[in-house]
Amino acid sequence: MKQPVFAVTSGEPAGIGPDICLDLAFARLPCRCAVLGDKHLLRARAEALGKSVVLRDFDPESGGAAYGELEVLHIPAVEAVEAGKLNPANAAYVLQLLDTALAGISDGIFDGIVTAPLHKGIINDARASTGFFSGHTEYLAEKSGTGQVVMMLAGKDLRVALVTTHLPLKDVAAAITQPLIESVARILHHDLKHKFGIKNPKILVAGLNPHAGEGGHLGHEETDTIIPALENLRREGINLAGPYPADTLFQPFMLEGADAVLAMYHDQGLPVLKYHSFGQGVNITLGLPFIRTSVDHGTALDLAATGRADSGSLITAVETAVEMARGSL
């Protein structure tokens, strides 16, 4: 089988993205990784970290990099980069990394995209007049013409997808509708089957309220919205269980045999996942017409060029992308 080729965007240049990308040169991965970024920045960061990395220009027709080598698709930064110090002038550079990766997907050069962290605040500071930048997920969805995507984080033996993502807690209940639950669950079911190769994925669903509403005594979202949605989905042949109280759902005996958990909101599901797998977790965007994985952490500006950044999540993100490429065959 031909090795998959992934675009790895190096993210915010002042953060740890370049640092952790350099470690891919020493990770024995069953794929090719083309790091998208400024090769002069990568070289300078390698020197600052004392890492002996040979940078090679990425060539789709070549055989790939040897151990200690890193394939780089050079995209110049707008201005010089100082580790740990954000510069709005380089926000356009960060977005150009994503646009170049998307173009490579369209041209059949890349089999997927793996993203190092970017800094949403500095991008919004730089493009205040051109609209709010929500993040990687929304940007890739918009640019690829994808109407709906689903955020899923994965760690060892645990996958957690979200019905709602970055919403204030006061807005969550109103946002959870029967059509939304059904569409999110369908995307989750489809991608578990077709991108992870799971024939009949079992999905556990969390309730919204304490004790999953206690039969309507602690809220009506379960009886009025969540349960009817699950009944419709089961009639379609989707293997769902729940809704369960979130405080018992994540116990090992409950998770046994489950392929994913569907949580209603961000801080219901992700604290458990991050406690379970922080540093080895992966952010996966479901619903896109291509594979996209990412690290589960931010830019960590204070760690840039210090040698204290952990590349474990990035390496796991690449390994997960390989798993998905194989599962989609």
Curated annotation (Swiss-Prot):
Its cofactor is Zn(2+); Mg(2+); Co(2+). This is 4-hydroxythreonine-4-phosphate dehydrogenase. Its main location: cytoplasm. Homodimer. Binds 1 divalent metal cation per subunit. Can use ions such as Zn(2+), Mg(2+) or Co(2+). It comes from Neisseria meningitidis serogroup A / serotype 4A (strain DSM 15465 / Z2491). Pfam families: PdxA. It is found in: Cytoplasm. One of its GO terms (biological process) is pyridoxine biosynthetic process. Keywords: Cobalt, Cytoplasm, Magnesium, Metal-binding, NAD, NADP, Oxidoreductase, Pyridoxine biosynthesis, Zinc. GO terms for cellular component: cytoplasm. A divalent metal cation binds at residues 166, 211, 266. Belongs to the PdxA family.
